[in-house]
UniProtKB/Swiss-Prot annotation:
The active site is at H51. The lineage of its organism: Bacteria, Pseudomonadati, Thermodesulfobacteriota, Desulfuromonadia, Geobacterales. GO terms for cellular component: cytoplasm; membrane. The keyword Disulfide bond does not apply. Involved in unsaturated fatty acids biosynthesis. Catalyzes the dehydration of short chain beta-hydroxyacyl-ACPs and long chain saturated and unsaturated beta-hydroxyacyl-ACPs. GO terms for molecular function: (3R)-hydroxyacyl-[acyl-carrier-protein] dehydratase activity. It is found in: Cytoplasm. Keywords: Cytoplasm, Lipid A biosynthesis, Lipid biosynthesis, Lipid metabolism, Lyase. The gene is fabZ. Its EC number is 4.2.1.59. This is 3-hydroxyacyl-[acyl-carrier-protein] dehydratase FabZ. Belongs to the thioester dehydratase family. FabZ subfamily. InterPro entries: FabA_FabZ, FabZ, HotDog_dom_sf. CDD domains: FabZ. Its main location: cytoplasm.
Length: 150
């Protein structure tokens, strides 16, 4: 699996940092179509301390957040300088389905397909798989806002 963006490049694109940076690398980027990211799920993730002791499961909302971060990378790379000083935010999350639990040792493959962009709202369809099996799917919308207007 070839790396398109490694973690150092991702950290130049996304504002997220540990423990909330949930993308380890990007392995595919097709302008106008899709992006594929990888998240290696380790027992050392801080959320496993409480979710759930003795039965660690990655929280579904963090899988959705990882999907959003992969989509955000796509939008930041596509728009470049136009959004360099802006922050990408969720606008909506729809039709989320959690199919299987994600546990320590799993490698999440997150494929985000771009549905379009209208009036500054990006629309994405996202699928997360582990070993080729679907674990989560969702439809996401995101937009950019100026940092100083927050």
């Amino acid at each position: 699996m070839e790396t398109v963006f490694d973690i150092n490049e991702i950290m130049k694109i996304l504002p997220h940092r540990y423990p909330f940076l949930l993308v380890d690398r990007i392995v595919e980027y097709v302008a106008g179509e899709r992006i594929v990211g990888i998240k290696n799920v380790s027992i050392n993730e801080p959320f496993f301390q409480g979710h759930f002791p003795g039965h660690p499961v990655m929280p579904g909302v963090l899988i959705v957040e990882a999907m959003a971060q992969v989509g955000g990378i796509y939008a930041y790379v596509t728009l470049g300088d136009e959004v360099r000083d802006k922050v990408c935010y969720f606008a909506s999350i729809d039709n989320v389905k959690f199919r299987k639990p994600v546990v320590p040792g799993d490698q999440l493959r997150i494929e985000v397909t771009i549905s379009g962009c209208k009036r500054g709202i990006w629309c994405f369809s996202a699928r997360a798989t582990v070993n080729g099996k679907l674990v989560t799917e969702a439809e996401l919308k995101a937009t950019f806002a100026d940092k100083e207007k927050l």
